[in-house]
Structures are given as structure tokens and as C-alpha cells.
Regions:
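The beta1-alpha1 cofactor-binding region of Rossmann-like NAD(H)/NADP(H)-dependent oxidoreductases
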Residues: 13-24, 56
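Active-site helix of classical SDR
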Residues: 74, 111
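Residue(s) in the substrate-gating loop at a strand-loop-helix junction
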Residues: 95
Length: 227
């Protein structure tokens, strides 16, 4: 445990894939600060294990961090938040890839799709359990310049982490559950069109991930141009 600033900031090395470590973190936080009122689960790794039938151990590692790391955080911290009778927030960091599922990193898409479903379920369960006292929210960043970006310099199309936080605070104040962030290349209208197309794959009985299917390439281009 490292004290970064006297009395108000602690950094604790934690393997979020291990529930016991989150329990230990929770105890340390409560000893230092008392009951938690804001829990932000920002666990994520972006390694690509490959195709759906490959590298099971690597798939497991990614899901253990990206999904189970968040579940562990909620299960370690939320019970005491509920018991405190104080207002609170839970923010889980998702991804647009968990909604539109672009081919490429299938395991990452899986983890973020499951996280979206989990956070939706969490929000509903909290509303039933305590009304509006503790709310859950899904942060869906756009292209953001972080250590996972892999670029030495910020790409022009990316937002900074600070921009994402400012947008998050604005949307939390408005009461949004889905905090869908734009970036410097993709606006909300574009995101909405892409997401609607993805949902229409089910409704219209198109092939899975038809946006990237050669038979639908021209139709998707016309659809996006018509907005």
C-alpha cells in the first residue's frame, strides 16, 4: 500500500481477477476513509487471444479481468454501501465493442458485452433494493488516449482521459445510465446508427455482424450516408 497524498489518496496493488484481493482492498479503504460512496470499476486488458476456438487460457485471463474484475469489485464493495444508508454511485467502464462487436478481438468484445448486461442488471437490482439511493452507470468511452492505445502521441481522433471524465460528470448530473461518449472522429449520431444496425441484425434476421458481411457492405454504406 502506497500513500500518494497525505490523508486522502491511497494506491493499492490489486489483482482484480482474485475476489480475495478485492475484499482486502475494501477493508483497507474502509479503514482509511470509511464507507465508500463512489465505486468505479475500470478494470480492463486488451490482449487479443485470437479466434473463438483458440487459446482458451488467454480467453479466460481476459474475461477474468474485464468481466470478473468488475463483478468482484461490486460484490466486495456494494454490500457495505447498501448497509450504510448513504447515497452512492457505481460506475463500470464498458466499451462500444460490447455493443457493435466489430470482428478482430472477439474475447474483448465478449467481455464488454457481458459487462454491459451485468451493469444493466446491477442498475435494476439496485433500484429494486434501495430506490434511487445507489445507482449504477455504464461508461462507454469513444476512442480515448490511454496506456492501452499503443501510440506514443495522442492521435487526433482520440479524446483525452480528462475529456472523458468531464463528459461523465456532466451525464451523471443529468442522471444518465448509458454514458455514451463521442470522440474527435465519431459523434453520437454515428454511434446511434451503428448500434441500431447491430440490433436490427436480430430484428431483420440478417447474418451475424452483417455490417462486416460482404453481401451487406453497400447497404450499410447507404444506411450510414442517409442519416
Amino acid at each position: 500500500m502506497t500513500e500518494i497524498a497525505p490523508g486522502n489518496v491511497l494506491a493499492v496493488a490489486t489483482d482484480v481477477s482474485q475476489f480475495a484481493e478485492l475484499v482486502r482492498l475494501h477493508a483497507q479503504v474502509e479503514r482509511s476513509f470509511g464507507t465508500v460512496s463512489l465505486l468505479m470499476n475500470n478494470a480492463g486488458i486488451g490482449n487479443n487471444p485470437g479466434l473463438p476456438w483458440e487459446n482458451g487460457e488467454a480467453w479466460q485471463k481476459l474475461v477474468d479481468v474485464n468481466l470478473w474484475g468488475v463483478v468482484h469489485g461490486v460484490q466486495a464493495f456494494v454490500p457495505s454501501m447498501l448497509a450504510s444508508d448513504e447515497p452512492g454511485l457505481v460506475i463500470n467502464t464498458g466499451s462500444k465493442q460490447g455493443i457493435t462487436s466489430p470482428p478482430g478481438n472477439y474475447a474483448y468484445n465478449l467481455s464488454k458485452a457481458a459487462l454491459r448486461n451485468y451493469t444493466e442488471s446491477l442498475a435494476h437490482a439496485l433500484r429494486v433494493a434501495c430506490g434511487a439511493r445507489i445507482s449504477a452507470h455504464l461508461l462507454i468511452p469513444g476512442f480515448t488516449y490511454t496506456g492501452m492505445t499503443g501510440a506514443a502521441d495522442k492521435p487526433a481522433s482520440a479524446w483525452t482521459a480528462e475529456q472523458v471524465v468531464e463528459f461523465l460528470l456532466e451525464r451523471l448530473a443529468a442522471g444518465d445510465f448509458y454514458v455514451l461518449c463521442p470522440d474527435n472522429a465519431v459523434d453520437r449520431a454515428t454511434d446511434e446508427r451503428r448500434m441500431r444496425w447491430a440490433m436490427d441484425d436480430i430484428i431483420l434476421n440478417r447474418p451475424a455482424l452483417s455490417r462486416w458481411h460482404p453481401d451487406f457492405e453497400a447497404e450499410f454504406a447507404r444506411y450510414m450516408a442517409a442519416r
